[in-house]
């Protein structure tokens, strides 16, 4: 266990899981490493797959703190700390196996399928995205606002028909904490749903090609073009190509200044998102100044795009070091907080764009559906750094627009190529 967990140790001890001497040593493996070591052992024992095959799956758990444990750390956890792992205690092993089977049942995965997956191997890109998703789940589950560390209220249990009557007494507390079978699993589903509602993560944006009638209509409905304005050739051609391709990939739009490349890129991004099922758009620029200017244009685009897509709101994030000084962005944040705290408002807002309370900050902000950022935020998806998996998760479901891509030096260009390779 990490740190001093003595305050919570009574819970497993009451259920019969004794902490043997030496199981709480200061040099014991961190729980991410322990989780990978235990999962490797369980998959091997249940499927017979060799350790080199199961590691691809188990490492998804191992790197949920942002950094993958080394092979030496995992081997050391197994060989030098069997007591901390529970490997020399039948009761602990039984609980680990039961929890392992329970998770497989929830996921609907048969042991035969798990063994086949281990032998076939997990594609690294998929493993990284799954690791990022696990990090996200871990942070949500660790959120004490969403899941407060208090006794379950009586109404949470009594709200289910024929459920166990819980009054908060010590006997009931012991019964609940021991995992008594009389307590319905729906109770914990309800607790999870309440926590999810408190976190209030909006669904990702989705687009349909049915909203695109023609090139002219799309540009007219998404951008504030003057009456009678004609499309630039590059705008019409870019959207025509986007509509024609079956499998969107990389598009390079090259034209002189003032030809409407930004509008063309956003229109193409909408079509690409509809064809690939992407849930957002990321627009990256070279400087904070250009990023601030672009944010205003993207915000204006979103106010037309989101209602046309049939969604009530979409999450937006401005990612650079001085985003707190952008008045338009801060205005969106202030409006969100006003409507959250105003009990008298009628539910209608002036803006369709929202800044998520949870998807906010240097690590989680990029998870928002729509992101306007300096290009380094995208480049970090191709660099070896902590929480790389979370960064790749945030980019994996987006159409990424890199503006002014000709303006970068050798090193950024190399990183851009790596980012494009990752996104492909």
Predicted regions and their residues:
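Inter-Walker segment of RecA-like/P-loop motor cores
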Residues: 307-384
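SF2 helicase catalytic motif II
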Residues: 388-416, 420-422
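Pre-Walker A (Motif I) flank of P-loop NTPase domains
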Residues: 246-253, 278-280, 367-369
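Accessory nucleic-acid engagement/destabilization modules that flank
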Residues: 1-213
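Walker A/P-loop NTP-binding motif
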Residues: 262-279, 297, 419-422
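Conserved Walker A/P-loop ATP-binding site and its immediately adjacent core
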Residues: 279-303, 317-327
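Conserved pre-motif I regulatory segment
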Residues: 214-254
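Walker A/P-loop
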Residues: 247-269, 404, 408
């Amino acid at each position: 266990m990490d740190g001093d967990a003595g305050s919570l140790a009574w819970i497993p001890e009451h259920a019969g899981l004794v902490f043997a001497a030496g199981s709480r040593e200061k040099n014991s493996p961190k729980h991410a490493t322990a989780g990978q070591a235990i999962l490797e052992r369980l998959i091997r024992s249940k499927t017979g797959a060799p350790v080199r095959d199961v590691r691809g799956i188990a490492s998804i758990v191992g790197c949920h703190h942002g950094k993958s444990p080394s092979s030496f750390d995992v081997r050391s956890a197994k060989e030098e700390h069997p007591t901390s792992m529970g490997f020399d205690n039948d009761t602990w092993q039984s609980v680990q196996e039961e929890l392992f089977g329970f998770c497989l049942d929830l996921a609907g995965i048969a042991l035969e399928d798990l063994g086949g997956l281990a032998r076939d191997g997990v594609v690294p890109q998929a493993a990284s995205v799954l690791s990022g998703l696990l990090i996200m789940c871990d942070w949500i589950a660790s959120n004490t606002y969403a899941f407060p560390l208090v006794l379950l209220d009586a109404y949470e249990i009594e709200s289910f028909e024929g459920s166990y009557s819980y009054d908060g007494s010590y006997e009931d507390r012991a019964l609940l904490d021991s995992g008594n079978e009389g307590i319905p699993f729906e109770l914990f589903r309800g607790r999870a749903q309440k926590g999810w509602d408190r976190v209030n993560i909006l669904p990702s944006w989705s687009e349909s090609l049915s909203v695109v009638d023609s090139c002219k209509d799309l540009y007219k409905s998404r951008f504030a073009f003057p009456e009678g304005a004609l499309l630039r050739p590059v705008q019409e051609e870019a959207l025509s190509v986007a509509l024609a391709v079956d499998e969107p990939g990389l598009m390079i739009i090259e034209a002189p200044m003032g030809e409407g490349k930004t509008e063309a890129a956003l229109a193409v991004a909408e079509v690409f998102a509809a064809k690939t099922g992407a849930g957002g758009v990321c627009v990256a620029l070279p400087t904070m100044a250009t990023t601030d200017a672009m944010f205003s244009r993207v915000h204006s685009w979103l106010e037309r795009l989101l209602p046309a897509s049939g969604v009530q709101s979409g999450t937006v994030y401005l990612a650079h070091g001085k985003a707190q000084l952008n008045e338009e962005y801060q205005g969106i944040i202030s409006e969100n907080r006003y409507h959250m705290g105003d009990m008298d408002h009628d539910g209608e807002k002036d803006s369709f764009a929202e800044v998520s309370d949870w998807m906010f900050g240097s690590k989680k902000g990029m998870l928002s559906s729509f992101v306007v950022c300096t290009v380094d935020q995208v480049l970090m998806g191709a660099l070896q750094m902590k929480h790389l998996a979370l960064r790749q998760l945030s980019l994996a479901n987006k159409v990424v627009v890199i503006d002014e891509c000709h303006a970068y030096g050798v090193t950024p260009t190399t990183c851009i190529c790596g980012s494009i390779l990752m996104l492909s």
